[in-house]
Amino acid sequence: ERIKELRDLMSQSRTREILTKTTVDHMAIIKKYTSGRQEKNPALRMKWMMAMKYPITADKRIIEMIPERNEQGQTLWSKTNDAGSDRVMVSPLAVTWWNRNGPTTSAVHYPKVYKTYFEKVERLKHGTFGPVHFRNQVKIRRRVDINPGHADLSAKEAQDVIMEVVFPNEVGARILTSESQLTITKEKKEELQDCKIAPLMVAYMLERELVRKTRFLPVAGGTSSVYIEVLHLTQGTCWEQMYTPGGEVRNDDVDQSLIIAARNIVRRATVSADPLASLLEMCHSTQIGGIRMVDILRQNPTEEQAVDICKAAMGLRISSSFSFGGFTFKRTSGSSVKKEEEVLTGNLQTLKIRVHEGYEEFTMVGRRATAILRKATRRLIQLIVSGRDEQSIAEAIIVAMVFSQEDCMIKAVRGDLNFVNRANQRLNPMHQLLRHFQKDAKVLFQNWGIEPIDNVMGMIGILPDMTPSTEMSLRGVRVSKMGVDEYSSTERVVVSIDRFLRVRDQRGNVLLSPEEVSETQGTEKLTITYSSSMMWEINGPESVLVNTYQWIIRNWETVKIQWSQDPTMLYNKMEFEPFQSLVPKAARGQYSGFVRTLFQQMRDVLGTFDTVQIIKLLPFAAAPPEQSRMQFSSLTVNVRGSGMRILVRGNSPVFNYNKATKRLTVLGKDAGALTEDPDEGTAGVESAVLRGFLILGKEDKRYGPALSINELSNLAKGEKANVLIGQGDVVLVMKRKRDSSILTDSQTATKRIRMAI
């Protein structure tokens, strides 16, 4: 009916005229297409704009810069003004003319501003694409870095840098505090001097360079940013293409080196007397690629067990998921309460375990396998695993079985559980069980039990010998083709850490502990500089030897004064700790007693002070001394797989002082130069500062002109004077109020040592 009516209307010429000639004036339609700045039909708009003769508007100045007609005689701009603005209407041909004949600007800033793009092109040019393989891709969503070549500034820090570089004259408080902010700002201001590129563009590009951008993407394979930038080229739903990046980027190197540094530091801290204090000391004194590790930790979102322990120690928030057996567990539903329970192993050993009572579901994500676990109190209900290979799947199954705390798992233990950590402390029961079955899980799998399975799409069974099956499977366990996504949330929670580096959330659940730190060794991409003496041994005995002597030489001025006035404090310095492991156990105490007696004689008899000898023997005096009459002409240190000798008097391959160059070499490596001349006879005595006198500080004119060493003997006890010592330095000294004999001094030293130990 309606269509017929419409046809009738259309047959009248007036209707046709109204529809084609008159303007549309229905308010609703006008509103729809004109409200807001957003173009409602961009494709149509583009089409009809380009059909016009002058679709572009330009600044008035363009008339002076462009001819009215081009070489072909086509008009480039119209004399009529743009309605509603004072701009002129221009033809698309004007753009062509401008591109061919317009003024050129310097191209020098382009590679600097578009640095990330230029670098990407280079990486792709030098990258190698291998063959395409067709196979099922187990992809799991992980949070990945999608922006290679960035610094690690927070959004706020980057904003301040960008404002300072691009809009330096804009009003607004900008606080550039961190070292990286200041360095980047200075560098960019220099690079972008006289830059003609639109400031907004520069700002966008700077943001790409300064801020880490992450996305939650399905990935099978490499997760570093140089792989993610070619994700669309390297993996599809059923295919993958091999690819080797044509270059590395600093942000990936920082992530990789940070993990290695954190692992080394946590491992080292675990074996020291106060793990937490040691860990903090090492984090604060370590640099990675020339940047302080603590600064990197504050900015870098990498989640790895050791890195998170370091962050927790610094009071930073970390992810609320917890780690067990190298898998990251995230509870997705359910809840539990913890109760201590005693259980008996198959070997009738009693274990005290904290049992989780209640139904819970977890996702487990590891490097090479992922799983979904549903469990009740001491019972595994269901485990769905997926992984790269049989080995990886087995690892995940073992961890889940141990985590389930099932009785048949505990009964599968054969032999005693006595695993210890690096500090020789027994591991907690859950980690005891884990280590036991990681070594050999045969009995565990045999005793677990098997069940017939239903045919479910995408799932198959797995037998106790880890072979796949469509008929039977380990009780509750299935293998899936699909991976389990990593936990996507980036929420961070406040945690606490105890002195043994166990990290807990606010409910007291343990999220991390040193047992969870991987033992994998890698080679860092960026130089890691550990200034802490605790890390000297990381490169072996030789490095300990060289570092110890370098430390003494670097700090000789203060060491020298302590040597003469408060030797006990000097001997207790932690810098001498690593050295003790090089001295044969049986000889440590004897060497120490011998060297301390020798030093005491040097302090007592003027003129026998010998800088080189003190430096050489000092590390040996740090061990608790044994009082014996033993004399030694050489002391043994264990390096290069055997005992090497340090001569008490004279040079040796281990310790060689060159008088001519005043340089010390240890095992052929340069250990530094001695600033003072050790052979000036009494000058040496002066610089050791005489026994019976206390150095009070710098010269004080109130106490008259500087005396020579010989004039000192006239001072009364408690009297102060300025003295001229070795290098023409003048210091203020005071004669001690009581004469301390050798005997009392050595006795108090020994007593103090005993107390300190």
From Swiss-Prot:
UniProt GO BP: 7-methylguanosine mRNA capping; cap snatching; DNA-templated transcription; symbiont-mediated suppression of host gene expression; symbiont-mediated suppression of host mRNA transcription via inhibition of RNA polymerase II activity; viral RNA genome replication
Annotated Gene Ontology cellular component terms: host cell nucleus; virion component
Assigned keywords, A-Z: Cap snatching, Eukaryotic host gene expression shutoff by virus, Eukaryotic host transcription shutoff by virus, Host gene expression shutoff by virus, Host nucleus, Host-virus interaction, Inhibition of host RNA polymerase II by virus, mRNA capping, mRNA processing, Viral transcription, Virion
Regions crossing the membrane: none
UniProt keyword Transcription, yes or no: no
SUPFAM superfamilies referenced in this protein's UniProt entry, alphabetically: PB2 C-terminal domain-like (SSF160453)
UniProt xrefs under InterPro entries: Flu_PB2_2nd, Flu_PB2_6th, Flu_PB2_C, Flu_PB2_CAP-bd, Flu_PB2_middle, Flu_PB2_N, INV_PB2, PB2_helical
Domain of life per record: Viruses
Compartments, record wording: Virion; Host nucleus
Role, per record: Plays an essential role in transcription initiation and cap-stealing mechanism, in which cellular capped pre-mRNAs are used to generate primers for viral transcription. Recognizes and binds the 7-methylguanosine-containing cap of the target pre-RNA which is subsequently cleaved after 10-13 nucleotides by the viral protein PA. Plays a role in the initiation of the viral genome replication and modulates the activity of the ribonucleoprotein (RNP) complex.
Quaternary structure (record): Influenza RNA polymerase is composed of three subunits: PB1, PB2 and PA. Interacts (via N-terminus) with PB1 (via C-terminus). Interacts with nucleoprotein NP (via N-terminus).
Family label: Belongs to the influenza viruses PB2 family.
Name used for this protein in its record: Polymerase basic protein 2
Organism, scientific name: Influenza A virus (strain A/Silky Chicken/Hong Kong/YU100/2002 H5N1 genotype X3)
Lineage: Viruses, Riboviria, Orthornavirae, Negarnaviricota, Polyploviricotina
